[in-house]
UniProtKB/Swiss-Prot annotation:
GO terms for cellular component: mitochondrial inner membrane; proton-transporting ATP synthase complex. SUPFAM superfamilies: F1F0 ATP synthase subunit A (SSF81336). This is ATP synthase F(0) complex subunit a. The gene is MT-ATP6. The keyword Transmembrane applies. Component of the ATP synthase complex composed at least of ATP5F1A/subunit alpha, ATP5F1B/subunit beta, ATP5MC1/subunit c (homooctomer), MT-ATP6/subunit a, MT-ATP8/subunit 8, ATP5ME/subunit e, ATP5MF/subunit f, ATP5MG/subunit g, ATP5MK/subunit k, ATP5MJ/subunit j, ATP5F1C/subunit gamma, ATP5F1D/subunit delta, ATP5F1E/subunit epsilon, ATP5PF/subunit F6, ATP5PB/subunit b, ATP5PD/subunit d, ATP5PO/subunit OSCP. It comes from Hylobates lar. The chain crosses the membrane at residues 12-32, 68-88, 97-117, 138-158, 164-184, 200-222. Pfam families: ATP-synt_A. InterPro entries: ATP_synth_F0_asu, ATP_synth_F0_asu_AS, ATP_synth_F0_asu_bact/mt, F0_ATP_A_sf. Subunit a, of the mitochondrial membrane ATP synthase complex (F(1)F(0) ATP synthase or Complex V) that produces ATP from ADP in the presence of a proton gradient across the membrane which is generated by electron transport complexes of the respiratory chain. ATP synthase complex consist of a soluble F(1) head domain - the catalytic core - and a membrane F(1) domain - the membrane proton channel. These two domains are linked by a central stalk rotating inside the F(1) region and a stationary peripheral stalk. One of its GO terms (molecular function) is proton channel activity. Keywords: ATP synthesis, CF(0), Hydrogen ion transport, Ion transport, Membrane, Mitochondrion, Mitochondrion inner membrane, Transmembrane, Transmembrane helix, Transport. The keyword Membrane applies. It is a multi-pass membrane protein.
Length: 226
């Protein structure tokens, strides 16, 4: 399909539907409420995964930091769902757009920094100057630490965008090679198709890992400010 300059501004669609519709409905289908005293295996597995994720991220936090538990589990569910839905044929992955990832990263990062200034302003400002810094280097180090602080949300967004985009490009290139070789050399087609299948499996893992990494880094930023 030919694309023009304004393709990135088009509304993302998944199987002909706006991407926002299945993304909003998908969590309610994945995590249904049980009407019985004993949950079935699917709900039990989902609750175990949620508790395991929260245990990995929230153990290091104090009481103030643990108030973000619902936000973080919602974030990892949203990113993982978006990444996985983007692997469906004829669909679009919103997390390949830097603008969307920045729209997620900047408010979350700003929230952690604002929490730090509200709870312990002195300690938050102290992070801008490492302990034991020589006096002549103090102005330069404050500038460097301030720049590194403001780079954090950009690094979050760029990391997610680059990893998801790179995987999709590889799948597109290998898929195109499979189609081309099917008309040139039939014996080579199964080999490349096997590689494409393995790459798709790897992309599923990358989609889940990147959701975890993004949420974990937000959790670490929160830990530094609470």
């Amino acid at each position: 399909m030919n694309e023009n300059l304004f393709t990135s501004f088009a509304t993302p669609t998944i199987l002909g539907l706006p991407a926002a519709v299945p993304i909003i409905l998908f969590p309610s289908l994945l995590i249904p409420t049980s009407k019985y005293l004993i949950n079935n295996r699917l709900i039990t597995t989902q609750q175990w995964l949620i508790q395991l994720t929260l245990k990995q991220m929230m153990t290091m936090h104090n009481t103030k930091g643990r108030t973000w538990s619902l936000m973080l589990i919602s974030l990892i569910t949203f990113i993982a769902t978006t990444n996985l839905l983007g692997l469906l044929p004829h669909s679009f992955t919103p997390t390949t757009q830097l603008s969307m990832n920045l729209a997620m990263a900047i408010p979350l990062w700003a929230g952690t920094v604002a929490t730090g200034f509200r709870l312990k302003a002195k300690n938050t400002l102290a992070h801008l100057l490492p302990q034991g810094t020589p006096t002549p280097l103090i102005p330069m180090l404050i500038i460097i630490e301030t720049i590194s602080l403001f780079i954090q949300p950009v690094a979050l967004a760029v990391r997610l965008t680059a990893n998801i985009t790179a995987g999709h490009l590889l799948m597109h290139l290998i898929g195109a090679a499979t189609m081309a070789l099917s008309t040139i050399s039939l014996p080579a087609t199964p080999i490349i198709f096997t590689v494409l299948t393995l790459l798709t499996t790897l992309e599923i893992a990358v989609a889940l890992i990147q959701a975890y990494v993004f949420t974990l880094l937000v959790s670490l930023y929160l830990h530094d400010n609470t």
